[in-house]
A protein has these predicted regions:
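N-terminal phosphate-binding loop and flanking beta/alpha elements of the actin-like ATPase fold
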Residues: 1-53, 58-167
């Protein structure tokens, strides 16, 4: 509530503690942090790693994220997506103009013109790849706190345009 009125001498009602996190969804690495006491701390994985590599592999045995996915960069690069943040908010035609060599094949048949990377799991949009990374960070935070996240702030680079920010 914006304004709470109470009787003089009465204790204010105890506010419910909510669990919020900050997420840096990076091009190369990502991480999640929260306030612990009066200090902001990054939340490590079960292996003690603060950083999660922003790599997703779509394999026969499921989806792998981070270090597990990195091992497939050479073995299966057509199904291992790295630096997906560069593709967020871009149209299929904009990606063709990049000039970068990308090992992926793109699905140009989507009705909205958005790009999708063709993987063995089907056509995957960049936002879906980002969601896989965010899902791992969310689980990491919820395992840390033993409760569900009530809110999150996700960073975006200053140079992102509106389309990229919305995705």
């Amino acid at each position: 509530a914006l304004l709470q009125i109470q009787e003089p001498g009465a204790k204010p009602p105890r506010r419910e503690q909510k669990f919020a996190v900050g997420i840096d969804l990076g091009t190369t690495n990502s991480l999640v942090a929260t306030k612990v006491g009066s200090v902001v701390e990054t939340l490590p994985s079960d292996d003690g790693e603060d950083l999660l590599q922003s790599i997703v592999h779509y394999g026969d045995d499921g989806i792998k994220v981070g270090r597990e996915a990195r091992d497939f960069l050479v073995k299966d690069n057509k199904n291992t997506v790295v630096s997906v943040k560069r593709l967020l908010g871009k149209s299929h035609s904009e990606i063709r103009e990049f000039g970068y060599y990308l090992p992926y094949k793109f699905d140009a048949q989507l009705p909205d013109g958005d790009p999708a990377i063709i993987t063995r799991h089907g056509s995957i949009r960049p936002i879906q790849v980002s969601a896989e990374i965010l899902s791992v960070l969310r689980k990491r935070a919820e395992n840390f706190s033993n409760k569900e996240i009530d809110g999150a702030v996700i960073t975006v680079p200053a140079y992102f345009n509106d389309a990229q920010r919305q995705q």
